[in-house]
């Protein structure tokens, strides 16, 4: 399981020309589910994401979490994080989980984030989405469990 976590001033998802979700200050998380990933791995990843201290405190040091700053969370499923371009120029996505299981874990990620008191929104699983963001910092982390 892989996640790209970006600290943002705002982020949004548009599908078929319609706004489906948007957040203000917080995290945009791109989530990639690999074959065989478990709920335990998802729990570990979400716990880590929500505990990250990547917002500045009063001295400018990265020391505050998403909850500390009252931030919001936008989670977008992105199977292309599991792409392998080590051979040739066209990536293989054979390492990505099958859609039904990936969707199940993605939806659990939304619930886990919301259950921790964080206003959480998502994209539309499997849709062609237009994701916009204003990266803050920029601060971008790649996490893998």
Swiss-Prot record:
This enzyme's EC code(s): 3.1.1.96
NCBIfam families: D-aminoacyl-tRNA deacylase
Motif (Gly-cisPro motif, important for rejection of L-amino acids): 137-138
Localization per record: Cytoplasm
Coiled coil segments of this chain: none
Xref: Pfam families: Tyr_Deacylase
Lineage: Bacteria, Pseudomonadati, Bdellovibrionota, Bdellovibrionia, Bdellovibrionales
Assembly, per entry: Homodimer.
Written domain comment of the UniProt record: A Gly-cisPro motif from one monomer fits into the active site of the other monomer to allow specific chiral rejection of L-amino acids.
Keywords, in A-Z order: Cytoplasm, Hydrolase, RNA-binding, tRNA-binding
One cellular component (GO) term of this entry: cytoplasm
GO molecular function: D-tyrosyl-tRNA(Tyr) deacylase activity; Gly-tRNA(Ala) deacylase activity; Ser(Gly)-tRNA(Ala) hydrolase activity; tRNA binding
Family: Belongs to the DTD family.
Catalytic activity: glycyl-tRNA(Ala) + H2O = tRNA(Ala) + glycine + H(+); a D-aminoacyl-tRNA + H2O = a tRNA + a D-alpha-amino acid + H(+)
Protein name in the entry: D-aminoacyl-tRNA deacylase
InterPro entries named in the record: Daa-tRNA_deacyls_DTD, DTD-like_sf
UniProt GO BP: D-amino acid catabolic process
């Amino acid at each position: 399981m892989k996640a790209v976590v970006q600290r943002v001033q705002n982020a949004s998802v548009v599908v078929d020309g319609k706004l489906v979700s948007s957040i203000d200050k917080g995290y945009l998380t791109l989530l990639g589910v690999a074959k065989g990933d478990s709920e335990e791995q998802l729990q570990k990843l979400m716990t880590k994401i929500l505990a990250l201290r990547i917002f500045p405190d009063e001295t400018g040091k990265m020391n505050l979490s998403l909850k500390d700053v009252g931030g919001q969370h936008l989670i977008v499923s992105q199977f292309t994080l599991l792409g392998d371009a080590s051979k040739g120029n066209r990536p293989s996505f054979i390492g990505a989980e099958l859609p039904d299981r990936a969707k199940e874990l993605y939806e659990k990620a939304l619930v886990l984030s919301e259950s921790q008191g964080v206003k959480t929104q998502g994209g539309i699983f499997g849709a062609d989405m237009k994701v916009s963001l204003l990266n803050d910092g920029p601060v971008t982390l790649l996490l893998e469990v």
